[in-house]
């Protein structure tokens, strides 16, 4: 981002101003097309790879210079030949570039916030990684959880108004209004009621969609930051980054201290936080050790706070209060709950001995098998009952490609659920994928599974389904003692970017 800033000619005193003229610079479109530019901040663009060229960019900039008024009303834009026959394509290119330009204040504020604290920035950090650190918190002493549906603005103009605190260039905000009014599905951009319209918009404008959503989440999470700063249990933290990143970097800092002690201490990343927070798929979870009355006050406080200060429409019914002792947290393929672990203690007093029954609260994260079987059945690896079937659509591939695809799916699932305390369900998934792979190969060679395995041997599939303990010992061969300790502890892999489907390469 430092190279990006110097290339644009921005300094700290004017980084929020005069963003709009950058849209007339050709190198901005080159930067938008570059996939390797600061992937931690700027999303990878896959919208116009095959069509973008310098000639098209020059033609677009020339038309913008020739047009007297770039920002037009919706009715006038339907009658103007500004964008010509390639209106949709030009509009998509401009929306991608405009979102990059408007991301500059967000990116620079995040970097400056980390520099002030001396925190090393993680380039591969994604929102999904905050789930792993959330599941490592000490939930055994907590009482209630709030399941919150993130509220959405009643009108997209509220999003533009919120951006005024970040972007002080009025022309850039007018350009954003132009793109928002350009699409007829603007009322369903953030809402979840019209998934078809929102999906249509996001597919054509990935970067602009996520930029608007991120700015919306920053406004939404400011209420939690306010409560966090009011708590005596936590330090005041700058709101220069998303709340999930604040938690992540704080936990990573404490995790480094645990590593220096060679795992002699328990891995409680936050000793006694005022609240535990995580956000996922338009929802968020807030866990606390407060009473039901306190959680109910929080519930109505959030509703009134969002409605009064941010004009975010919400209702108390969108926030659910659940007691952690008899409620499990189900989100993104995980099922977590607090259970009582019985234990018996023998006490000796003089000549008398006593047996004391004791119950200890323990927070377990398991891998639910039924959702995984449902995903495998949807992708045609097994039927609804979990019986493996061959992947007929892959029968035309080479043997190495078939085995590699099945092995990649299992490794992704294994990495994603590697931190779970109970992973017996993964053995069922491994069985389904191995037998499905064998049936796919047998179908290709026009043979039976038994004859195929007898001919090539079952060792053909073993190397592609290596256990995680073996992978770790191969990666760190000199620290076998630490690896043995790690094998008994949850291990979270930060190479997971998304888990929306089983085979994201298709």
Swiss-Prot record:
Keywords: Chloroplast, mRNA processing, Plastid, RNA-binding, tRNA processing. InterPro entries: Domain_X, Maturase_MatK, Maturase_MatK_N. GO terms for biological process: mRNA processing; RNA splicing; tRNA processing. One of its GO terms (molecular function) is RNA binding. One of its GO terms (cellular component) is chloroplast. Signal peptide: none annotated. It comes from the Eukaryota. Usually encoded in the trnK tRNA gene intron. Probably assists in splicing its own and other chloroplast group II introns. Pfam families: Intron_maturas2, MatK_N. Belongs to the intron maturase 2 family. MatK subfamily. It is found in: Plastid, Chloroplast. PANTHER family: MATURASE K (PTHR34811:SF1). The keyword Mitochondrion does not apply. This is Maturase K.
């Amino acid at each position: 981002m430092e190279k990006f800033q110097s290339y644009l000619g921005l300094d700290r005193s004017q980084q929020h101003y005069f963003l709009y003229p950058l849209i007339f610079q050709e190198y901005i479109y080159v930067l938008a097309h570059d996939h390797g530019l600061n992937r931690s901040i700027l999303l990878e663009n896959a919208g116009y790879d095959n069509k973008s060229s310098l000639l098209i960019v020059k033609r677009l900039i020339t038309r913008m210079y020739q047009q007297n008024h770039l920002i037009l009303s919706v009715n006038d834009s339907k009658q103007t030949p500004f964008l010509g026959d390639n209106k949709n394509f030009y509009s998509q290119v401009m929306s991608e570039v405009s979102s990059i330009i408007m991301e500059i204040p967000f990116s620079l504020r995040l970097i400056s916030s980390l520099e002030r604290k001396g925190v090393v920035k993680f380039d591969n950090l994604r929102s999904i990684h905050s789930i792993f650190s959330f599941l490592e918190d000490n939930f055994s002493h907590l009482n209630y959880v709030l399941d919150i549906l993130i509220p959405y603005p009643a009108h997209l103009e509220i999003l533009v108004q919120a951006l005024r605190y970040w972007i002080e260039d009025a022309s850039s905000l007018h350009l954003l209004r132009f793109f928002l009014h350009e699409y007829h599905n603007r009322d369903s951009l953030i809402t979840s009621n019209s998934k078809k319209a929102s999906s249509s918009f996001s597919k054509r404008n990935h970067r602009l969609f996520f930029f608007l959503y991120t700015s919306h989440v920053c406004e939404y999470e400011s209420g939690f930051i306010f409560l966090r700063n009011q708590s005596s249990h936590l330090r005041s933290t700058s709101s220069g980054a998303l709340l999930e990143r604040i938690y992540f970097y704080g936990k990573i800092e404490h995790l480094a201290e645990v590593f220096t002690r060679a795992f002699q201490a328990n891995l409680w990343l936050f000793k006694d936080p005022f609240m535990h927070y995580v956000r996922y798929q338009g929802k968020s979870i807030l866990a606390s050790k407060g009473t039901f009355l306190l959680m109910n006050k929080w519930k109505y406080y959030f509703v009134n706070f969002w409605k009064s200060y941010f004009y975010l429409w919400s209702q108390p019914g969108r926030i659910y209060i659940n007691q952690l002792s008899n409620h499990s947290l189900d989100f993104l393929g995980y099922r977590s709950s607090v259970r009582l672990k019985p234990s018996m203690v023998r006490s000796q007093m003089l000549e008398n001995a006593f047996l004391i029954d004791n119950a200890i609260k323990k927070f377990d994260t398991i891998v639910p098998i039924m959702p995984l079987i449902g995903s495998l059945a949807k992708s045609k690896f097994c039927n609804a009952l979990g019986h493996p079937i061959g992947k007929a659509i892959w029968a035309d591939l080479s043997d190495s490609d078939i085995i590699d695809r099945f092995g990649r799916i299992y490794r992704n699932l294994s990495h994603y659920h590697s931190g779970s305390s109970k992973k017996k369900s993964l053995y069922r998934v491994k069985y389904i994928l191995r037998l499905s792979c064998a049936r796919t190969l047998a179908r290709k060679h026009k043979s039976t599974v038994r004859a195929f395995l007898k001919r090539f041997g079952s060792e053909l599939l073993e190397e592609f389904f290596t256990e995680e303990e073996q992978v770790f010992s191969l990666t760190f061969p000199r620290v076998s003692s630490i690896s043995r300790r790690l094998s008994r502890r949850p291990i979270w892999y930060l190479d997971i970017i998304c888990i929306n489907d089983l085979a994201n390469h298709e």
